[in-house]
């Protein structure tokens, strides 16, 4: 049984509300969007396997996806996007707060009334010839006090099937929402309406793209893209941009962080949250396998990308992974770099923009040392290693992705769906720096840790001989994802630390790491990957009050003898290469920090400028 229709501008659009939907506000909102966008029909997604299979079959028929060889990759698919729709579009991403200063200088801002007028024009009739899918989803385990619900209205079946993997999606969410529950409304269209009888294309999209957030009303509108974070609105749009503003208002944190558990041979368990910008090995670190010399240690994965953290009754910060799947970058993922990720991808995966092998499996750069002799590349063209060498063309797009259920990860933590979250013992912040920043530093206190995170960055270009690469500052790895003024975000971190300390809680320790120092020959000086466990163990020793280290201008760094070296031949001279600090380089670095602070000066917390002055004084000169 269904109920309710709405009369659109040109025809009646059946809303077809299932009897189990009791939320009048939700029904009315769906009706308003249907009236605006004029879809042929409305489908309320129940999240079932049958629904998923039906939509995947339809997309195979539509040539949006290819079914992979069931013997090689059971129940898995490859989607190839339009070449113009392959990544997040930061320059088309807007934070439309009521006041421009609330968005701040690091976000694109348009006045809300002006943006709403633009969106109304774009969305009017945008879903003609298509189906509007109502996608109810929970970010975090249903019923968790840390979780929040969203509803995405989308005309893309690709979005529906990916959201089923990436979130808890379906009827159970509507049941939890009840008659008056709160939800974040998300509207998405690929922006390509179909005329009567018009043949659809495999990957519909529009050259005009808008990814828009209204922080005060907690709304998300996305137009023109069917890809990734532009279209899966639970991910960066909700889980970071909107959730960060919710956290600011309500006293919690939404962070671009992995969460991992570490259990010692004695059974002591620790929980770490870590923020790294893109291309810095976040997923690899989340799924780390302890190296030789660490028998009896276990690292488990709670999340690989996003963390929501709320203060518990004991004053500690408790974190959940709000996602239910991994939307990971495929290139560079291989048996050497991340065997746990590869094992996660054995079945039930949607791959996007990777290459197709002759026997119906997938391949990407970094999966194997030697590419197959013949492939179909991400644009559907024949590809051979010779073509790659001659043209520089990659078989898989550099931002090609996999969407896989987190439950399939061999290293998944037993508490990954604990509704109460896990207590965080430490935060790690890291960037990709070939010089200057040492392997690991412990901040003296919360304020200096916030300073470290606020000034972190990664090199964006290959460094010329003897020169440092251009450093892109990415505070807290949140530059593209903070939904409000970055200076206010720093203040929020500082205030939360004060609040937790006032409640008598032991604050998480804060560390800065850099796995990417290079030697004189331009080679990475630290082996990285599983060997990062050696740094992690030192942090755990410090948490327990056991670890030693040497104090310097910025905090505490371990001496050679403070790390556990069993199973790795790494000399004191090699260690000096990754931990040395050049005062001249650091004076130049602090001058770059000043440039960042100048940009954010209007609301920059005094504590950060004071911390910078203290560090300069310690550094001398």
From Swiss-Prot:
GTP binds at residues 279-284, 401, 432, 529-532. GO terms for molecular function: GTP binding; manganese ion binding; phosphoenolpyruvate carboxykinase (GTP) activity. Pathway: Carbohydrate biosynthesis; gluconeogenesis. Residues 391-414 are annotated as: Disordered. It catalyses: oxaloacetate + GTP = phosphoenolpyruvate + GDP + CO2. Binds 1 Mn(2+) ion per subunit. CDD domains: PEPCK_GTP. It holds the Pfam family PEPCK_GTP. Its EC number is 4.1.1.32. It is found in: Cytoplasm. Its cofactor is Mn(2+). Monomer. Belongs to the phosphoenolpyruvate carboxykinase [GTP] family. NCBIfam families: PRK04210.1. This is Phosphoenolpyruvate carboxykinase [GTP]. It comes from Burkholderia mallei (strain ATCC 23344).
